[in-house]
Design a protein with these regions (language model features):
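Transmembrane beta-strands of outer-membrane beta-barrel proteins
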Residues: 84, 115, 149-153
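Short strand-turn segments of transmembrane beta-barrel domains in outer membranes
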Residues: 56-62, 70-105, 126-128
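Outer-membrane beta-barrel translocator/channel fold
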Residues: 35, 127-137, 141-168
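Transmembrane beta-barrel strands of outer-membrane/channel proteins
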Residues: 86-90, 119-121, 153-157
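Transmembrane beta-barrel architecture of outer-membrane proteins
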Residues: 15-18, 28-33, 99, 121-123, ...
């Protein structure tokens, strides 16, 4: 990750056993108090006002802040061997099933160049009529790190489809 102001890197040692890993997949694990429509991938907002980010120019994207990749939450890697992480979670019965497929693949080419890709696919059938969600986000990223120069870049795209039932 990069810092907000000048883009310095946060150094984080990779750990093979993440603590409270199951909380990273649940909506409730993103904050102490979250308001949302009940299924994975639906718009959400923190009920704690100080946790909310500054509003965007396109206000409808604010409810998807937890799903969007921004320069402040994009991860970059510097690995000695190729790294991959694949996660598949499923919740609920057949009529209300929620699924998430999330993956990262990255590899260094030489000592200075790293290239990788992220994928996040969420599909929720919904608990109510016309309450389904389908979110697809992907990102191609790379970085160049030498003694004198550092460059970080990524290209990301998100496609969110939510069915609306007019309120619960």
């Amino acid at each position: 990750r990069l810092t907000d102001k000048i883009g310095d890197t946060y150094i984080a040692p990779m750990d093979t056993n993440r603590m409270n890993y199951y909380n990273s997949t649940l909506v409730e694990g993103k904050s102490v108090a979250i308001g949302y429509l009940g299924n994975l991938g639906s718009p959400l907002q923190s009920k704690i006002f100080s946790e909310r980010k500054e509003e965007r120019d396109f206000i409808f994207a604010d409810a998807y802040d937890y799903y969007l990749t921004t320069p402040t939450n994009a991860n970059f890697f510097d690995t000695k061997i190729p790294y991959s992480n694949l996660m598949y979670t499923t919740m609920g019965g057949s009529t209300q099933k929620e699924e998430q497929l999330k993956g990262t693949l990255t590899s260094n080419f030489g000592k200075k160049v790293n290239v990788g890709a992220d994928l996040d696919y969420i599909y929720g059938r919904g608990y109510y009529n016309s309450n389904g969600t389908k979110l697809l986000s992907y990102r191609l990223f790379g970085n160049y790190i030498s003694d004198r120069y550092q460059m970080y870049a990524y290209l990301a795209n998100s496609n969110f489809v939510n069915f609306e039932n007019g309120g619960i």
